[in-house]
């Protein structure tokens, strides 16, 4: 396992874990969390679940917060300790987690995507609005970037808003018109884009 810090301040941390060995034997993963792995999951899904939890624990420890099991709540969302808000995302061989102190952040979200993965117009048209489609066609943003931005925003909003959102509902360009306190930023790592999103208190 290879651990990288993408962002670290006194109130928020973003950690990334890359596959380097069989991490299912990783000692830092708590037994309570490995019991959440479902038998029907593929070996890759099992591994990325553990990698995501390792990234999350690393972020929690970076902030000096209590390192407790990160269990699963409704819809499989992670349950964080009382002093933390967080989000996890992963691809086949890489995982990221963002954790913020709950006295500073109301909610956070994160998404990771491979920049080399290109979406056809018939694919990104399923989740993009007209302005987003125009920005793709003009080469300002890629379909993958817009998808990742929407995922990070969606993960942020779903923890504080009872409305049910779809990717089509999320405006990844003019999001602050509807959510003025929402902050979105992108970190580039190798061939990956990591979009982080948060709402401060």
Map each language-model feature to its residues.
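Core catalytic alpha/beta fold that binds nucleotide/phospho-ligands
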Residues: 1-201
């Amino acid at each position: 396992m290879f651990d990288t810090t993408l962002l670290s301040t006194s109130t928020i941390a973003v950690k990334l874990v890359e596959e380097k060995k069989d991490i299912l034997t990783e000692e830092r993963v708590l037994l309570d969390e490995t019991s959440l792995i479902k038998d029907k999951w593929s070996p890759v899904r099992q591994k990325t679940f553990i990698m995501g939890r390792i990234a999350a624990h690393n972020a929690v420890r970076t902030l000096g917060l209590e390192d407790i099991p990160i269990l699963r709540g409704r819809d499989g969302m992670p349950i964080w300790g009382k002093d933390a808000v967080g989000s996890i995302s992963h691809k086949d061989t890489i995982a990221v987690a963002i954790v913020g102190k709950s006295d500073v952040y109301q909610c956070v979200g994160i998404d990771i995507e491979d920049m080399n993965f290109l979406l056809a117009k018939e694919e990104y048209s399923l989740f993009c609005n007209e302005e987003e489609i125009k920005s793709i066609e003009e080469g300002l943003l890629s379909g993958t970037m817009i998808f990742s931005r929407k995922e990070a925003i969606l993960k942020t909003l779903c923890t504080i808003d009872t409305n049910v959102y779809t990717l089509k509902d999320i405006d990844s360009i003019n999001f602050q018109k509807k959510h003025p306190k929402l902050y979105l930023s992108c970190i580039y790592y190798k061939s990956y884009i990591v979009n982080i999103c948060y709402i401060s208190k």
